[in-house]
């Protein structure tokens, strides 16, 4: 959908949508790139696309591009305005724990999978937080076998909201990420992007 210069290739996108009209389409990308290079480009072109039959999975947050950040509700609302996209899901994950993502449910909560767990820890002594108590996020996965990525203490703050009782009906722990810890080094996909462009 983007050129090598990260410009929206509107003609290519429109052609793709015409070829796959009536079919379910999966869109995947980094949150900030979808916002900057897809949503904003459509607004500047004053064009609309029909993505009402698509699902968007996005992640990576805003990190260094905080000045561009919008709330999840606004992100959803604006994308629906320009392209009818309403099936939008965020995820939480990191390259250090490849293969393990925590998907957002229709209620806006992130969920641990069958193969993963999430724990929040108190910053003062690293003891486990109670449900509803913010803490440092630890992610656990049984997937990594070739490197020690099975248990990672992140630099993110989150809160576990509950277990087996999410209104969406999914079982397991569900949680929210509140942001980076104070004084945490900002790094990730948006850093690579910001450094390059």
Model-derived regions: residue spans:
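Active-site glycine/GP-rich loop and adjacent strand/helix microenvironment
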Residues: 1-197
């Amino acid at each position: 959908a983007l050129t090598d210069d990260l410009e929206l290739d509107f003609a290519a996108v429109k052609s793709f949508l015409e070829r796959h009209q009536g079919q379910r389409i999966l869109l995947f990308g980094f949150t900030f790139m979808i916002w900057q290079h897809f949503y904003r480009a459509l607004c500047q072109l004053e064009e609309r696309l029909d993505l009402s039959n698509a699902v968007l999975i996005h992640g990576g947050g805003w990190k260094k591009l905080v000045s561009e950040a919008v709330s999840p509700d606004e992100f959803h609302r604006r994308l629906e305005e320009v392209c009818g996209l309403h099936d939008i899901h965020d995820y939480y994950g990191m390259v250090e724990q490849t293969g393990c993502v925590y998907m957002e449910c229709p209620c806006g909560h992130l969920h641990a999978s069958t193969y993963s767990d999430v724990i929040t820890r108190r910053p003062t002594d690293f003891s486990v937080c109670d449900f509803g108590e913010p803490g440092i996020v630890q992610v656990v996965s049984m997937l990594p076998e070739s490197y020690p990525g099975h248990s990672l203490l992140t630099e993110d703050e989150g809160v576990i909201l509950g277990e087996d009782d999410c209104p969406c009906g999914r079982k397991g722990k569900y949680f929210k990420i509140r942001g980076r810890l104070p004084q945490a080094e900002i790094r990730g996909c948006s850093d690579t992007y910001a450094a390059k462009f």
